[in-house]
Amino acid sequence: MVLLFLCSGCSTKETAELPADPVVAKLILAQEAAKVNYVEGETFDPTGLIVNAKMSDGTVVENVPFTLEVDTPLTRTTLFAVMRYEGKTVNQQLRITLLGNDEQYSAANMQYVPGSALEGKLFYWLGSSVTYGASACGESMADFLAKRDGAVCIKEAVSGTTLADVKKESYVQRFNSYLLSEGCAKHVDAFICQLSTNDRNMPESFGTVSGEQVREPEAFDCAMTFGAIEYIIAKVEEVWGCPVLFYVNPPLDENYETMVNGLEQIAQKWGIQIVDMYHDVAFNQLTEEQRSLYMADAIHPTRAGYRDWWLPKFEEALELAVKP
């Protein structure tokens, strides 16, 4: 009996392992937070969040406790809140509105001020993202000027486009299309064009300013930035004969400064007006708090920036332009 017992204990078969406890394989966002839209500076509210855990054995544990990781307060760069449980994470996407784009700064909430010298005037705006208001919910100084001063603004603006006619929907292409359209205005009180920040990425296409006697639109090389500017000015004079204003952004880089310098030569040749936000030191003296409120990035203003910072500059320039 003893011999049999010992032989039985010497079996070479492996001892069967007990099944391991299931572990968390991944987290599932079962229910989003009740509020996902915020203005920067607010605090995220996790009310409504439900997180489930899918286990390694295929089962699901519902409504697991989680730790929350999120910027407090929320910033313009906050993309999501992170829920963490047992080494796994799941994200709640957030949509953060810049403080300067809060509804209180919208054109809809801009008060009309009667008696403006710009009331009833028709202005044509040609530009790209800054003229469009790409970082301000599609609202720019043109929209605020129309609302406050009672002006009529035609805003021809497409983000990412250039003055130089080397890409689709360039300033030149769109302006020519408008001039050929059935709805082309017969009279414009002033023409305002953006010195595109997109052209600064193509310094090889800046070109040169033409001689004093070169005035016909067909004489200019529109594939060059400076040629396109002169072509546009010549066409405006030919079609409408109205004041022409070009506006320049606050300081950016050396390439943009080269463009500003070229525009100044062109302005002297053609007698056009520059809305100069590049060299205006007093205009650019902002506190960090103001800059954060007024600018979405180095190039694009927020609603508050257009309304409270840029608009008075354009009102002053346009009042001068339309003055009898």
Per-region residue spans from a language model:
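A short acidic, glycine-rich active-site loop
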Residues: 214-225, 296-301
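Catalytic His-Asp segment of secreted/periplasmic serine-dependent ester chemistry enzymes
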Residues: 251-324
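N-terminal secretory targeting modules
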Residues: 10-23, 93-126, 130-137, 147-148, ...
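Bacterial N-terminal signal peptides
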Residues: 1-7
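Conserved SGNH/GDSL esterase-like catalytic core that processes O-acyl groups on lipids
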Residues: 122-125, 130-214, 218
